[in-house]
Amino acid sequence: MANQELIDALRDAEAVKFGEFELSHGGTSEYYVDKYVFETDPGCLRQIADAFADRVGDAKLAGVALGAVPLVAATAVETDSPYVIVRKQKKEYGTGNQIEGDFDAGEEVVVLEDIATTGQSAIDAVEALREAGATVDRVIVVVDREEGARENLAEHDIELESLVTASDLLADR
């Protein structure tokens, strides 16, 4: 069932835009969900953190840098849980870490993400966490664009959950 309150908040914040947009995977779309709008709007961020908190259980939280960092931080505050940040690649300076924050080998981790289109950034984050010893089988996103992410993640034994889908956001528009 769609989270109508969150859908309304995303629409009211004007996070859903219409026009011609190039997406990060190279495709184009007639609509765009602007994560920076909903991640910087306190009302949207609060609703997202509350919704994530209802779903994460006791798992350690992980967010994909950069887009999911505000989401995982807000959810960590809501759940009083520590979290880790997964970079797209290892740093070439300082500690050289790809994963910032601590977790124990075998610990259950759930990845929080902003928007899923193909799911590749979530897959990359899960693979990095698994290589580091975490147990990861779930990714929760704010918006599933319904363009193959669920199927792509399933090929890697990862379940995709979404707070809302593109169909939810675009209904009645």
UniProtKB/Swiss-Prot annotation:
InterPro entries linked: OPRT (IPR023031), Or_phspho_trans_dom (IPR004467), PRibTrfase_dom (IPR000836), PRTase-like (IPR029057)
Binding site for orotate: T117, R145
Protein name: Orotate phosphoribosyltransferase
Positions with a binding annotation for 5-phospho-alpha-D-ribose 1-diphosphate: R87, K88, K91, E113, D114, I115, A116, T117, T118, G119, Q120, S121
Reaction catalysis annotation: orotidine 5'-phosphate + diphosphate = orotate + 5-phospho-alpha-D-ribose 1-diphosphate
Record's subunit section: Homodimer.
Reported cofactor(s): Mg(2+)
Metabolic or biological pathway, per its Swiss-Prot or TrEMBL entry: Pyrimidine metabolism; UMP biosynthesis via de novo pathway; UMP from orotate: step 1/2
Pfam families to which the protein is assigned, alphabetical: Pribosyltran
Record function comment: Catalyzes the transfer of a ribosyl phosphate group from 5-phosphoribose 1-diphosphate to orotate, leading to the formation of orotidine monophosphate (OMP).
Gene3D superfamilies membership: 3.40.50.2020
Annotated TM spans: none
Keyword vocabulary terms for this entry: Glycosyltransferase, Magnesium, Pyrimidine biosynthesis, Transferase
UniProt-recorded Gene Ontology molecular function terms: magnesium ion binding; orotate phosphoribosyltransferase activity
Keyword tRNA processing: no
Homology family: Belongs to the purine/pyrimidine phosphoribosyltransferase family. PyrE subfamily.
Domain of life: Archaea
EC number(s) on file: 2.4.2.10
GO biological process: 'de novo' UMP biosynthetic process; pyrimidine nucleobase biosynthetic process
